[in-house]
Amino acid sequence: MTRDAALPGSHSTHGFYENYEPKEILGRGVSSVVRRCIHKPTCKEYAVKIIDVTGGGSFSAEEVQELREATLKEVDILRKVSGHPNIIQLKDTYETNTFFFLVFDLMKKGELFDYLTEKVTLSEKETRKIMRALLEVICALHKLNIVHRDLKPENILLDDDMNIKLTDFGFSCQLDPGEKLREVCGTPSYLAPEIIECSMNDNHPGYGKEVDMWSTGVIMYTLLAGSPPFWHRKQMLMLRMIMSGNYQFGSPEWDDYSDTVKDLVSRFLVVQPQKRYTAEEALAHPFFQQYVVEEVRHFSPRGKFKVICLTVLASVRIYYQYRRVKPVTREIVIRDPYALRPLRRLIDAYAFRIYGHWVKKGQQQNRAALFENTPKAVLFSLAEDDY
């Protein structure tokens, strides 16, 4: 199907075509496609999400109604959270009997997932900026009793200044006080244990906003390690790992990170929802507080002299440490190249350029798992899986 052939006919979507000129495809979902578009009066660029509520004619009347209601619910939630600096802004909407057109700000930097693919792993500094913004978004959503239910790097966009914008509220839901959910939805490797338990136990009480915090932990781990905390080629075994909270800080990347960042990740990946960190608790964690600089500093000659002495002492130690560094021999490189950080990054970068995909570096570290998520969040029934 050509690019133009995939577009809805202009006779049925006169309002959209009157104001916007659709361009190339930016992404696809199960029943939707995202295109760049130009606003004709201003010549500004936007992104339009075109949702075919009929599934190309393959959906039943009941499925069409469900998708229509889900889209209207997504639009309603987007309007409720409009104005937040880190949430994608819905600019315009158009509706016909068969299509919805949702016009958003265009994020030219693309997905956080693509940025991570390019960078392999992120530093603590980059991760701190991204996670603080994400947690502030989640905090705002949860105060409105809105649960996102599909948090993952693919649904986090970046603007030109590398600020994040949370998107894809298709599975979002605004809860009534005390309400619990039982639907199994989301992307398998980001599912919280209680969501999986709901599919296996008819008597399970359900789940709430805590599922977003679990997904946040998976995202943070993935940004730092470059691979997800829970992965197995057999999906059922991966789900068992999630339900038992079976993950490790065993890959070489974790040797470069502080205990503080590991502690925060472990506060998210707690199997019991009631013991899991909330967004507010996470923002108060030392990981986000240790680099906060006071606006006013009182001058202290004694303190300044102490800093100078410590700086000189540190410089001397670094110099002698540098002098004692052992040369990298051929035997060391052959025996364990991943133990050397510069070589590790070089190998990762060239492996991707040569093979076009990431290579497995160990049983507990598989970047290929990152690419197993479908473009749109997955709906599935665990009851149909065989052990």
UniProtKB/Swiss-Prot annotation:
Class in the EC hierarchy, top level: transferase
Residues of the Protein kinase domain: 20-288
Residue numbers spanned by region Calmodulin-binding (domain-C): 343-367
InterPro entries: Kinase-like_dom_sf, Phosph_kin_gamma, Prot_kinase_dom, Protein_kinase_ATP_BS, Ser/Thr_kinase_AS
CDD domains: STKc_PhKG1 (cd14182)
Cysteines engaged in disulfide bonds, as pairs: none
SMART domains per record: S_TKc
EC number(s) given by UniProt: 2.7.11.19, 2.7.11.1, 2.7.11.26
Binding site for ATP: 26-34, 49
Record remark on domains: The two calmodulin-binding domains appear to act in concert to bind a single molecule of calmodulin and are pseudosubstrate/autoinhibitory domains.
Assembly and binders: Hexadecamer of 4 heterotetramers, each composed of alpha, beta, gamma, and delta subunits. Alpha (PHKA1 or PHKA2) and beta (PHKB) are regulatory subunits, gamma (PHKG1 or PHKG2) is the catalytic subunit, and delta is calmodulin.
Family: Belongs to the protein kinase superfamily. CAMK Ser/Thr protein kinase family.
Name the UniProt record assigns to this protein: Phosphorylase b kinase gamma catalytic chain, skeletal muscle/heart isoform
Organism of provenance: Oryctolagus cuniculus
